Amino acid sequence: MEKSWFNLMFSKGELEYRSGLNKAMDSIENEKTTISKDRFIYDMDKNFYGWGERSSYYNNVDLLVSSKDIRNFISDDTFFVRDSNKNSYSIYFDIKKKKFEINNDLSDLEFFFYSYSYCSSSYLNNRSKSDNDPHYDPYIKDTKYNCNNHINSCIDSYFRSHICIDSHFLSDSNNSNESYIYNFICSESGKIRESKNYKIRTNRNRNNLMSSKDFDITKNYNQLWIQCDNCYGLMYKKVEMNVCEECGHYLKMTSSERIELSIDPGTWNPMDEDMVSTDPIKFHSGEEPYKNRIDSAQKTTGLTDAVQTGIGQLNGIPTALGVMDFKFMGGSMGSVVGEKITRLIEYATNQCLPLILVCSSGGARMQEGSLSLMQMAKISSVLCNYQSSKKLFYISILTSPTTGGVTASFGMLGDIIIAEPYAYIAFAGKRVIEQTLKKAVPEGSQAAESLLRKGLLDAIVPRNPLKGVVSELFQLHAFFPLNKNEIK
């Protein structure tokens, strides 16, 4: 049997194939193809995933000299691949004997691979569109994107027709013959372990296969990923400081995440955690009672209301901190939010502590009527005493979104007003303005960058240096870290 070697890139996520062999595999003729030296493909930077019991994931080839030749490439029985750890393997298909083998002893092939890898890479770099390539397909542009799509399609067609790796092997058949393949099982750690006696069988019972929990395995990991609001890309939920790795968009942070970002570990002491709303005006809408919405938000966020307040150390400097949480009913300001912030400011006044309020709110909470509006005046009053009478230092940090009554009260009363990049800051939202005034709101006019140019903000600071910037501002206003004797 003639063998041809070439290099593929594999990574999780592009094409999904459920391992299994066609019941009628004996009828498939064996294909033989040779590959000319000037049409080899190499580039193994990506991960390689072995065939598992249920599914395997293969990525497309990165680049070809001629897209048309992929049908010849994938028709061969042996594939030469390399994983992200630079380990080389050969994947061997024997259609006639129904074998599937992976060999990781390729020392004799290394020189062969590297010699042609260098030649082909040079050829790819020097080749221009004006060359008369006899293998050029006029319907496929010589771009990485189109080439990948074409190769994906070819690989998909080959495996579907020759190994029947889709719904074909799930269907019932009168043929009771069971197909077996020997497999190398890839462990979770990514290391390949040999299992000579391990077999994968095509099952004729569709219900047994479809009832497997493996088909719903992704449901168990929904909480691990988050989607960017701007580019819609998926990323690990614990991405550093909730900043999109692709486009740099700032994602929303919970109040607990912001406290962890700002306060030194082990120094946070929360205040008034047991304060909850009692539906003071017995608000009830046709959709859902206010009390039910409060209960639902508490279960979802683990908070009692839309703000966390407390005392902690920021780079060793004792600080009074209040952080609003947009996930709790849009960060709306009700009587509990107003009372907790008021008590925090009063405590900071008595203890002569610097104050930070991190704003993220849709405004006053309509379910509490005039009681929520009253919080604006109450907070502004205690802030006046804190700033004017005691001459203490208050930093307001505006995040996206900060709107309504929060913007009209303590959000814009800081001695220093800092905003995050691209933060949406306004009193009335764009839709409300356009429907009320019947005028279009210019794009970006309510963004932090626009407000900075108009003098409404003092600075726009990214999340990474924010803690250091605030610490320096505190020291400029004579708030210094505690010495070792004062730290308990």
From Swiss-Prot:
GO BP of this protein: fatty acid biosynthetic process; malonyl-CoA biosynthetic process
MF terms (GO), sorted A to Z: acetyl-CoA carboxylase activity; ATP binding; carboxyl- or carbamoyltransferase activity; zinc ion binding
Boundaries of every CoA carboxyltransferase N-terminal domain copy: 224-488
Keyword set includes Iron: no
Catalytic activity: N(6)-carboxybiotinyl-L-lysyl-[protein] + acetyl-CoA = N(6)-biotinyl-L-lysyl-[protein] + malonyl-CoA
Gene Ontology cellular component terms for the protein in this record: acetyl-CoA carboxylase complex; chloroplast stroma
Entry-linked PROSITE patterns: COA_CT_NTER
Keyword Disulfide bond: no
Binding positions for Zn(2+) per the UniProt entry: 228, 231, 244, 247
Positions of C4-type zinc fingers: 228-247
Compartment annotation: Plastid, Chloroplast stroma
Similarity field: Belongs to the AccD/PCCB family.
Protein name, entry field: Acetyl-coenzyme A carboxylase carboxyl transferase subunit beta, chloroplastic
